[in-house]
C-alpha cells in the first residue's frame, strides 16, 4: 500500500499517473469539497464535504486539524474523526473550535488533514492492484470577527522592496495572502507561497536587475485573482 501526499501548492501529478501505468487497476482516494477552509470566528462550526467517486472501492477516512509547526495541539476537533464511506456516497466533516488561544486581530493558519485508506477487495487478485493511501492537507484559516478590510482585495495591499538579491514583501492587512504566482520581469519565484497578516516574507530574486513585480493570489474559494503589477 502506497501513501501519496497532496497540499495547497502544485503537486507532481505525472508521478501519480506513472504509478498507475504499472498496474492494470489503481485504487485512488476521495474528493474533498474545496482546496481551503475558512472558519469565521462568529460561527460555531464549518462543514467540508467528502465524496467517494469510486465505483466499487470502500474507503476509510481519517481527519484531524493541526498547527503548522506540529508542536501544539490545535484547538479544533473534526467529527466524525474516522468513518467508512461507500462508493458513490457523500459525507460531511464538521470542524468545531474547542477553545484555545488564537489571535483576534488577524487570521491564524492551521491545517486540515484528510487521509483516505481504500479497503482491500478480497474477491480481486491483489497482484495487479495498486492500493493508494492518499493524504491531503488543506489550509484552514481561522478568521476572527470584526477584522478590517476585505479579504478578497487584501492581495492588492502588498508592498514590495528589493534589497540586493532579495525581494521583501509586506502585508499590512489582517489576512493571509497566498500567492498563485509571483513573477519578477516575467520570471516566476517558485518558492513564493504566502505572506502572513501584518507581517512580511522574503524571497530570492531570480535576477538582481529586476524592475517589475507581477502577482496573482488565491482567494477564499480557491479561485485566482486578477494580476497586479508594481515597479520596484
Regions found by a protein language model. Give the residues of each.
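Asparagine-centered strand-capping/turn motif at beta-strand->loop junctions
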Residues: 50-54, 167-173
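Intrinsically disordered, low-complexity Pro/Gly/Ser/Thr-rich segments with frequent PxxP/GP/PP motifs
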Residues: 74-101, 187-211
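Beta-sheet-dominated interaction scaffolds and their linkers
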Residues: 28-51, 150-159
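Short acidic/proline- and small/hydrophobic-mixed sequence motifs that coincide with surface turns
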Residues: 55-61, 105, 174-179
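Surface-exposed binding patches on compact interaction domains or structured appendages
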Residues: 31, 49-95
Amino acid at each position: 500500500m502506497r501513501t501519496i501526499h497532496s497540499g495547497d501548492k502544485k503537486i507532481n501529478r505525472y508521478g501519480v499517473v506513472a504509478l498507475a501505468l504499472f498496474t492494470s487497476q489503481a485504487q485512488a482516494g476521495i474528493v474533498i469539497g474545496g482546496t481551503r477552509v475558512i472558519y469565521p470566528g462568529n460561527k460555531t462550526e464549518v462543514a467540508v464535504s467528502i465524496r467517494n467517486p469510486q465505483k466499487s472501492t470502500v474507503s476509510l477516512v481519517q481527519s484531524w486539524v493541526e498547527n503548522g509547526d506540529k508542536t501544539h495541539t490545535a484547538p479544533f476537533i473534526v467529527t466524525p474523526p474516522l468513518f467508512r464511506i461507500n462508493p458513490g456516497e457523500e459525507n460531511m466533516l464538521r470542524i468545531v473550535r474547542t477553545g484555545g488561544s488564537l489571535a483576534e486581530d488577524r487570521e491564524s493558519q492551521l491545517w486540515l488533514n484528510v487521509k483516505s485508506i481504500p479497503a482491500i477487495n478480497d474477491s480481486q487478485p491483489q497482484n495487479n492492484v495498486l492500493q493508494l493511501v492518499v493524504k491531503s492537507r488543506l489550509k484552514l484559516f481561522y478568521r476572527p470577527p470584526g477584522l478590517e478590510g476585505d479579504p478578497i482585495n487584501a492581495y492588492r495591499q502588498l508592498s514590495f522592496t528589493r534589497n540586493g538579491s532579495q525581494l521583501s514583501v509586506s502585508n499590512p492587512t489582517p489576512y493571509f495572502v497566498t500567492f498563485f504566482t509571483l513573477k519578477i520581469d516575467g520570471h516566476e519565484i517558485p518558492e513564493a507561497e504566502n505572506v502572513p497578516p501584518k507581517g512580511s516574507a522574503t524571497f530570492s530574486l531570480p535576477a538582481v536587475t529586476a524592475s517589475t513585480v507581477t502577482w496573482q493570489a488565491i482567494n477564499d474559494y480557491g479561485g485566482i485573482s486578477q494580476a497586479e503589477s508594481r515597479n520596484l
